[in-house]
């Protein structure tokens, strides 16, 4: 997956695909390296989501939960989408990576340059998407509580996956 908003460096596609081939059962996740074009409001909003993701996974494994540059392991992702109802807008990327992490998949974070073009178009709907994201974080928080014994066991006993 690479968002079509022109923010991500498409020259990194071969590196992401090579990492996915080397680790076919892992999520290859972009870890943005921002330049001076990044709006401060977006950085703050993204950080708030990252904190919730770290709480909801009881880990720091997901370096950036909102990056639109990823390679998903297909079978695990299809299985997840077949059994769970996940968001379809700005909440999709966050919810999918959290749920894949819950299922025991490794998250491999690769640095990638991100720029915000001056003439870029955002499809973010301020109120609607913030409400969706807040509701998603609440659902994930309660999902984490239910899964917390297994998530904590995974942290304490790394051989426990899934």
Protein language model annotation of sequence segments:
Residues 6, 32, 112:
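Active-site loop/turn elements of alpha/beta-hydrolase fold enzymes
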Residues 1-7:
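Short beta-strand-to-loop acidic/aromatic patch adjacent to the donor-nucleotide binding site
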Residues 10-90, 117-124, 128-134:
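Acceptor/aglycone-binding surface of glycosyltransferases and processive sugar-polymer synthases
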Residues 83-162:
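Hydrophobic helical membrane-anchoring modules
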Residues 1, 30, 110:
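Short beta-strand and adjacent tight-turn residues that come in two discontinuous sequence segments
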Residues 1, 18-21, 139, 143:
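Generic secondary-structure signature for well-ordered alpha-helical cores
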């Amino acid at each position: 997956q690479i968002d079509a908003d022109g923010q991500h460096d498409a020259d990194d596609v071969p590196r992401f695909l090579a990492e996915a081939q080397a680790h076919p059962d892992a999520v290859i996740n972009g870890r943005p390296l921002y330049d001076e074009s990044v709006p401060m409001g977006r950085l703050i909003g993204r950080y708030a989501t990252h904190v919730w993701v770290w709480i909801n996974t009881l880990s720091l494994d997901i370096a950036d939960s909102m990056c639109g540059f990823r390679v998903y392991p297909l079978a695990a992702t299809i299985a997840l989408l077949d059994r769970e109802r996940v968001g379809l807008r700005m909440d999709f990327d966050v919810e999918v990576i959290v749920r894949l992490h819950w299922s025991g998949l490794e998250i491999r974070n690769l640095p990638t340059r991100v720029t915000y073009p001056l003439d870029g178009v955002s499809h973010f709907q301020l109120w609607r998407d913030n409400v969706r994201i807040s509701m998603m974080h609440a659902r994930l928080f309660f999902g984490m509580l239910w899964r917390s014994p297994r998530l904590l066991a995974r942290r304490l006993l790394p051989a426990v996956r899934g």
